[in-house]
A protein has these predicted regions:
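Ligand-binding pocket segment of bilobal, Venus flytrap-like solute-binding proteins
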Residues: 70-72, 78-82, 155-240
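C-terminal lobe and pocket-closing loops
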Residues: 219-290
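Short, polar/charged alpha-helical segment
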Residues: 39-57, 169-171
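A conserved helix-loop-strand patch within extracytoplasmic ligand-binding domains
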Residues: 101-156
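N-terminal segment of the mature folded domain
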Residues: 65-120
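Short, well-ordered beta-strand elements
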Residues: 27-39, 57-62, 151-155, 286
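A bilobed periplasmic-binding-protein/Venus flytrap-type ligand-binding module shared by bacterial periplasmic
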Residues: 114-124, 266-278, 301-302
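C-terminal functional modules
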Residues: 262, 275-276, 283-341
Length: 341
C-alpha cells in the first residue's frame, strides 16, 4: 500500500514507498483519498486493506486536508473517498454529482453530529444552553484567548477543513465574532489536545467538535452541546454559497446570509464514475461497506489508544474481531483476507 503522508496544495503525486509486499492485479487499482482526522483514517485503512489483500489490487493512499484532497478527487487524481461529510460540502459537490463524474456509494457510518460544545461544569455553573447564552455579560472572559485577550476563544476546525469556514460564518451570523475568535488549532491532534488539556487542567472549554470520535467516548470528557437555530435546508444552502465564496476568495467577500445548526447526518462514500466502470467488483465492495456507529467508536478507541495511529494494525484488528465485512465481499476475497490475519 502506498501512502503519501503530507499532501501539498500543489497535489503533485509521486510514487510512494510500498509498505508491504502485495500481489497486485495489474487490471485492478484504487487511489484512495484520506483526511487528517481519525474516523477517516480508520475507514481508509480498512478499505485499503481489503482492496489490496482481498482483491489483490494496487492501492495508493494520499492524505491531506479537505480542500486539496477533494480537488484531487474532482480532477481524477484520487478515485475513492470512504468518508464524506457531505452536508458540509453541498455547493462543492453539486456540479460533480450533476455531471455524473462522481457517484454516491451509500453510508459508511449511520449517525454523526457536529456542534459547538462547552464543558458541562462551566455550562451548568453559568446556565449556558445555547449560542445566545454565550453572549451573556462576562461569559467570553471565561474562555479568554491568550493570543487575543480582548476576546474569548472558540476552538474551531483546522483552516483546511470546510467546517472552519462554516464556523467563521456561524460566529458572524450569531453575533459571536465580536466576542470570540474562530481559533485554528493547526491539526486534528491539536484540537483533541486543546479539549483534553482543558479538562485535565479544570479550565473552561468552548469548542467545535464532532462524533463519532475516541475523544468524546472518554469518561473524563463531558461536554454539553449548545443549542442553535434548528437545521433548515434552505438556510444551510444559503450559508453554503457564502462559505464556498469565502474559501475561494477570502473573508473579505463575506455577505450576511443565514446560519443554523449542523445537520446530524450519516457519513457517506463516493467514487469516480470512470474508476467504478473500470473496477466493478471493488466498486461493489465500496458500495456495501458500512460499519455501525458503536463499532466505529470502538475502532477509534483502538486506533488512538492502542495502536498509536497504526492504520494497518487497526484494519487487521477490525477484520479479526468483526464479521459484518464478510457480507461486503465474495467468499474468495474473504478467504484471501483471512489468510493475512
Amino acid at each position: 500500500m502506498k501512502f503519501l503522508k503530507n499532501l501539498s496544495a500543489s497535489l503533485v503525486f509521486a510514487a510512494g514507498l510500498s509498505l508491504g509486499a502485495t500481489n497486485a492485479n495489474a487490471g485492478c487499482s484504487a487511489h484512495l483519498g484520506d483526511f487528517d482526522w481519525d474516523s477517516a483514517n480508520v475507514h481508509t485503512a480498512i478499505a485499503s486493506y481489503v482492496i489490496e489483500k482481498g482483491f489483490g489490487c494496487d492501492v495508493q493512499v494520499s492524505k491531506g486536508s479537505t480542500t486539496p484532497i477533494m480537488a484531487a478527487f474532482f480532477d481524477g487524481q484520487i478515485e475513492v473517498i470512504t468518508e464524506l461529510w457531505e452536508d458540509n460540502l453541498v455547493e462543492l459537490l453539486k456540479p460533480h454529482f450533476a455531471d455524473g463524474s462522481i457517484l454516491h456509494r451509500g453510508v459508511n457510518t449511520p449517525a454523526s453530529e457536529q456542534a459547538f460544545w462547552v464543558d458541562r461544569a462551566t455550562a451548568e455553573a453559568h446556565g449556558l444552553k445555547s449560542v445566545e447564552d454565550m453572549k451573556k455579560p462576562g461569559i467570553w472572559e471565561l474562555f479568554k484567548d491568550p493570543e487575543d485577550p480582548s476576546k474569548g476563544r472558540m476552538t474551531s476546525c483546522i483552516s483546511g477543513w470546510t467546517c472552519y469556514t462554516i464556523n467563521y460564518v456561524k460566529l458572524k451570523e450569531y453575533g459571536l465574532d465580536e466576542m470570540y475568535t474562530n481559533f485554528d488549532p493547526g491539526s486534528g491532534g491539536a484540537l483533541d489536545a486543546a479539549i483534553a488539556g482543558g479538562f485535565a487542567k479544570g479550565k473552561p472549554v468552548f469548542s467545535y467538535y464532532w462524533t463519532p470520535t475516541s475523544l468524546m467516548g472518554k469518561p473524563e470528557i463531558d461536554m454539553v452541546r449548545l443549542e442553535e437555530p434548528a437545521y433548515d435546508a434552505q438556510c444551510w444552502q444559503d450559508m453554503s454559497v457564502v462559505v464556498e465564496d469565502i474559501k475561494a476568495n477570502g473573508t473579505e467577500v463575506y455577505a450576511p446570509s443565514c446560519a443554523c445548526e449542523y445537520k446530524d447526518m450519516a457519513l457517506t462514500k463516493t467514487v469516480r464514475a470512470d474508476w467504478a466502470a473500470a473496477n466493478p467488483e471493488v466498486d461493489a465492495f465500496i458500495a456495501a461497506y458500512s460499519i455501525p456507529t458503536e463499532t466505529v467508536n470502538n475502532l477509534l478507541a483502538y486506533y488512538v489508544d492502542v495502536s498509536g495511529g497504526d492504520m494497518e494494525a487497526t484494519a487487521m484488528w477490525y477484520l479479526e474481531n468483526n464479521t459484518e465485512w464478510l457480507d461486503w465481499v465474495p467468499s474468495d476475497v474473504a478467504a484471501n483476507i483471512r489468510a493475512t490475519l
